[in-house]
């Protein structure tokens, strides 16, 4: 029997690593980390295929999810709270594709851990589907792997953080909207 239970997210004691964007140097006399594997902090988001996009959006909105962005008639990015990461769930309607799991994303600390985790997965024999790369809609860095359960898994980091002031955006689907840049089949 499947049972759902309301719970709250537990705090995780993870120290992020400062970066040095142009004009805002924060990491001084300290090199960026090199990770030999990833240690995910949380499940960042889940993506489901649906053939009932409008009904699914209404369902998740009734649970309190807020729409962040959308591909009209094709996909909806939704978050659990007004002040949160870009999306916790993405509902994706593709022609001739019924309901199912597309992927589960695991959040890691930074882009360096995306690379370290991705290279580790490759060394363990897991096949890269796409990555590393960057999603322009959420600004997140990613690396996707095939999953023996079906669907994909993703390491991701550096997702946009939204507030109640965020205005939903609409995008036309296309390869550059999915990935600003990406390596097909990985760098392994």
Question: Where are the model-predicted features located?
Answer:
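Core segments of cupin and vicinal oxygen chelate
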Residues: 48-86
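Histidine-centered active-site/metal-ligand motif
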Residues: 45, 85-87, 103, 134-136
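Non-heme Fe(II) oxygenase catalytic core, chiefly the N-lobe of the double-stranded beta-helix
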Residues: 27-31, 35-58, 65
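Flexible internal linker/loop segments at domain or repeat junctions
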Residues: 84-101
């Amino acid at each position: 029997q499947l049972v759902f239970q309301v719970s709250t997210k537990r705090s995780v004691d993870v120290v992020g690593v400062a970066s040095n964007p142009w004009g805002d140097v924060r990491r001084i006399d300290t090199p960026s980390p090199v990770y030999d594997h990833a240690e995910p902090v949380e499940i960042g988001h889940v993506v489901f295929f649906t053939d009932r996009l409008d009904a699914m959006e209404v369902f998740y909105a009734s649970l309190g999810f807020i729409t962040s962005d959308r591909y009209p008639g094709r996909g909806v990015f939704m978050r659990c709270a007004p002040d949160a990461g870009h999306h916790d769930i993405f509902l994706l309607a593709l022609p001739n594709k019924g309901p199912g799991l597309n992927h589960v994303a695991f959040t890691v600390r930074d882009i360096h851990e995306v690379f370290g985790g991705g290279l580790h997965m490759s060394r363990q024999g897991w096949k890269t589907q796409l990555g590393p790369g960057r999603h322009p809609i959420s600004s997140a860095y990613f690396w996707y792997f095939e999953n023996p359960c079906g669907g994909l898994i993703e390491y991701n980091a550096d997702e946009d953080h939204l507030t109640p002031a965020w205005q939903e955006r609409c995008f036309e689907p296309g390869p550059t909207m999915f990935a600003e840049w990406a390596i097909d089949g990985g760098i392994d």
